[in-house]
Each structure stands twice: as C-alpha cells, then as structure tokens.
Amino acid sequence: MTTETTTTKIIEANEIMKLLPHRYPFLLVDRVVDYEEGKWLKAVKNISVNEPCFTGHFPEQPIFPGVLILEAMAQATGVLACKTYRQLENEIYYFAAIDNARFKRPVLPGDQMVLEVHFLKERRGITRFTGVATVDGQVVCEAELMCARRPA
C-alpha cells in the first residue's frame, strides 16, 4: 500500500504584497490557502463590516460589490501567474479581460469568500483562467478572466 503525502502551500499577506502591487484598501486577497503552480489556486477574502465600500454600498444594507468580487478573483489569478511564471522584478500582471461573469448571491459583512481560480491556457503573455467565488460552499460568482504579463 502506497501513501502519498500532500503538502499544503500557504501564502500569507506579506508574501502576497511582494507579488501584487495592490495595498489596503484594495488588496482583496487575504491569504492563499493552497495552490499548484500552473494549475489552480485557492485563496480567501474575509469580508469585514469595516470595508470602505460599505460606506456607500449600501449603508443600511451593506453588500460587497460584485466588481470587487471580480477584482478579488483577478488578484488571485495574478498570484497564480506570478507563482507559475516566476515574475521578474520588471514585470507586472494586468487584469486584461473578463467574460461570462455571473453573480449568484450577495456577499455580506462577516462572510469569508473563498476564491478558486484555474489556469486554462497562456498565449503571447496573455493567460486565461476560470474563477469561482463561494461563501459557505455556495457559489456567489463565477467568471472567465484574463491577465497580461507586461514590463512594469
């Protein structure tokens, strides 16, 4: 009988900030909980009642904006791309496009949003991914995303 050992790869916030140019309040990936280079990445974003977006979206009934859910997924693809392609000092990954975005339910203060992105293909510096965001195992958003690797 063979036993395979799997090691979880975690990336903490300080390492994420070395990979992405985003900073508070626009860094939307709190922690990577596991990934496989060139294949997939799973990250979390904890939604606090103190998120700046809740001041205007909506004060009496705060809902995390869909565009920020997509941005969080895009940032997760950026982390996966950086880990896959060993980002150089003079390179940056830009969010290039989004297709087939679907929103299934609202994300509220107190939720932990789990972001799962999967590598599809890379061609001429453009990388295509699929992404799914869930809360408590329920899909809140899904989309296809592209990022472009360019000189900084």
UniProtKB/Swiss-Prot annotation:
**What residues form the catalytic site here?**
H57
**Primary place of residence?**
cytoplasm
Main EC class the enzyme belongs to: lyase
What Gene Ontology cellular-component terms does the record carry? cytoplasm; membrane
The record's section on CDD domains has: FabZ
Q: Kindly state which reaction or reactions the protein catalyses.
A: a (3R)-hydroxyacyl-[ACP] = a (2E)-enoyl-[ACP] + H2O
Protein name, per record: 3-hydroxyacyl-[acyl-carrier-protein] dehydratase FabZ
In its UniProt entry, the species of origin is given as Pasteurella multocida (strain Pm70)
